[in-house]
Amino acid sequence: MGLFNNFKFKYTRAQLEIFRFSFCLLAPVAVMYYIGTDTDKKLNVPGFWPDPATLNQIPKEPYEIKAELARMKKERLEKRLRLEKKIQEEFGLDLEEEKEKIKRDLALKKG
């Protein structure tokens, strides 16, 4: 106890303000320095980014764009035909007949 009583050092208000200012100024700088050095080793997560070969490739050339549009139209047509077939099988509806009914109803509403 006597050892600590002999060592009485009190901080003045100016010293505390200087410490606070320097801490507030240097702490973010120290964190940024720590994070900024060797980021490949510290923050590297293997397998985080997907392999570029597995990503969708955006067509850039005109022939690639046309081929992609043709593929999309083909998929959409196949899906539509599949759904029409499913409707005909499950509900027994004739789609052409239903389309004609809708056209007649719309013509009656207009006229």
From Swiss-Prot:
Pfam families per UniProt: Pet100
Gene designation per UniProt: PET100
GO BP, one annotated term: mitochondrial cytochrome c oxidase assembly
Lineage: Eukaryota, Fungi, Dikarya, Ascomycota, Saccharomycotina
InterPro entries cross-referenced by the UniProt entry: Pet100
Subcellular location field: Mitochondrion membrane
UniProt main location, coarse: mitochondrion
Coiled coil (UniProt feature): none
GO MF annotations, alphabetized: unfolded protein binding
Organism: Saccharomyces cerevisiae (strain ATCC 204508 / S288c)
Keyword Transmembrane annotated: yes
Record's keyword terms, sorted: Membrane, Mitochondrion, Transit peptide, Transmembrane, Transmembrane helix
Family: Belongs to the PET100 family.
Sequence intervals crossing the membrane: 18-36
PANTHER family recorded: PROTEIN PET100 HOMOLOG, MITOCHONDRIAL (PTHR33968:SF1)
Protein name: Protein PET100, mitochondrial
